[in-house]
Structures are given as structure tokens and as C-alpha cells.
Design a protein with these regions (language model features):
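HhH-family (HhH-GPD) DNA N-glycosylase catalytic core used in base-excision repair
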Residues: 1-170
């Protein structure tokens, strides 16, 4: 879930190639080198060395300014807040989130700067902690309007329509 949290914080107002580039930069700066098997480098787009995903302590050590220098933009303060909360125990990214209700889990995650309902729902869905989480972005809104207009008109809860695996149904 730490990797999901960082990745979804970076996803805000961003595109996939840029998100990948930022993660590669953060990993190169803060991650540990990963040993490659002989012949693996030829499958890595010219990368000779791979690095692990940066842990919370490494990102916190960079500080907001250091994170900003890694081209994270306005998200630097969000990453720093998430890292500091995670390290201090103020952000649980474990089974604790699965053991509480969806709305409470969303509320817990939304205490972090930069995490709103959609990002929290993405973290909960893709971590496997809450398959009932139903992240709605502009594309999902358009899809629902096109394919399930009555759902939107009624203001129905997606779980009432799609069941306990509403997020998977997306």
C-alpha cells in the first residue's frame, strides 16, 4: 500500500509517462539497487541498473524541497506529509484498513494532505483491502452516465447496484 499511496498521490493532474518518470527518478535517488540476472538488461529499455521503490524514510529525508527538486511539483508537500505520517504511525497502510468499514477507511486516508475520496478509494481498491471501494474520476463519471444513467439519477450507492465487489466491477 505504500507504493500505491505514493503512485496515486503522483497521479493527480498527471499522465502515465510523467508518473513513471517521477517514480524512476525517486527510485534512482532513494531506492536500493536491484541485482539483475545475466541477460536481463537487454529487456529493460537500456537500463543497466534498476532501483527499488523508495521507502517512507527516504522520501521524508528529502524533505519538501528535495521532493520538489525531483520534479514532483505541487505533490511534494503531499508526499512529504504521507511519508511523515506513515513513519510516525499516523497513517496505517496495513490490514487495519481492511478491518474497518469503507467510509471509515476513506476518512483515515483523507487525513493525509492531497488524499481525497478518489485517491483514497483507489488505494483501498488496488490494495485489495476494500473491493467495494468505487473510485470515480471524470472517465468513470462519463461511463456511468452513458451506461447506467438511472444509477446517477437516483444517486444510488454503487455497492447497492454492483454488490460488495463494486470496485472490481468497474
Amino acid at each position: 500500500p505504500w507504493e500505491l499511496t505514493v503512485s496515486f498521490l503522483l497521479s493527480q493532474n498527471n499522465n502515465i509517462p510523467r508518473i513513471k518518470k517521477i517514480i524512476r527518478t525517486l527510485s534512482g535517488e532513494c531506492g536500493a539497487p536491484i541485482s539483475l540476472q545475466p541477460g536481463a538488461a537487454e529487456h529493460l529499455n537500456g537500463d543497466e541498473v534498476l532501483f527499488s521503490f523508495p521507502d517512507a524514510a527516504s522520501l521524508a529525508a528529502l524533505g519538501e524541497d528535495g521532493l520538489y527538486a525531483m520534479k514532483t511539483g505541487f505533490r511534494a508537500k503531499y508526499l512529504y506529509d504521507a511519508a511523515c505520517r506513515y513513519l510516525s504511525g499516523g497513517l496505517a497502510l496495513d490490514e487495519t484498513l481492511a478491518d474497518i468499514g469503507l467510509e471509515q477507511a476513506i476518512g483515515e486516508l483523507c487525513r493525509v494532505r492531497g488524499i481525497g475520496r478518489k485517491v483514497a478509494s483507489c488505494i483501498l481498491l488496488f490494495s485489495g483491502f476494500h473491493p467495494d471501494a468505487f473510485p470515480v474520476d471524470v472517465w468513470m463519471q462519463r461511463s456511468l452516465a452513458r451506461d447506467f444513467p438511472a444509477l446517477l439519477e437516483r444517486g444510488a450507492d454503487p455497492c447497492d447496484v454492483f454488490g460488495p465487489y463494486a470496485g472490481i466491477a468497474q
